[in-house]
């Protein structure tokens, strides 16, 4: 069997297609979170630019790794056996080289310019790899991993010694857990058919939906205690968003989580934008339990 050669243009094509596909699907929202946190913390413009570039590179790495590890499943999934997926299948070594290249660029770049970025690289990249390789098929661990990932990725936007950055990404982590719950509800039928044991497959749609509402309640409580009781009303309102259980589908009536996903995303997005605006304007959160300011340094 001939050894597959690796061409630079194949590597660049794979990276470019990952970027285009994920940006088109609005799946790099953590970049906006990182950029918003950096601006809210009043970091210098050059600092913000470095962090945004790093966030983009980190997103390329984790999503390419996800596509690489999910390749076999994607080829069988409806609508995913496209030219992009087939190209990655036919150029696996180029996909591996692309990942290694991104790791080198991110590690060297962070070490030379901003060593503190190695922390979100290790946390975000490590959690995403573990999720794609194993945790996504472990009930409970799939949602826990996305809570950790949802906090780790936007941590790019904050120096790790600033308590305010941690307070904000903690809220995003809870949001991410709720979104993962909705996602596994959406994918319940396909995962069950493929033998993938997610939280929704293990618990069923009804109990997973209850878990999503519990996580939204936790987000509301966290928001009231740490961020703002007024903004906490938005994740509380998200608890009331219904799940469409009778949507028409090719296989007949069933559960369609798309509408719920979009409505919850709108409410939680507005909550976080409000938090960023408040922090940018006042320099502090305004929770009923704690107020974390830009001047608060850990340790």
Model region roles, listed by residue range:
Residues 32-68, 117-129, 164-182:
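Membrane-embedded alpha-helical segments that form the functional core of polytopic membrane enzymes
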Residues 12, 225, 230-299:
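Extended hydrophobic alpha-helices typical of membrane-associated regions
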Residues 55-82, 176-199:
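Acidic (Asp/Glu-rich) catalytic motifs at the cytosolic membrane interface
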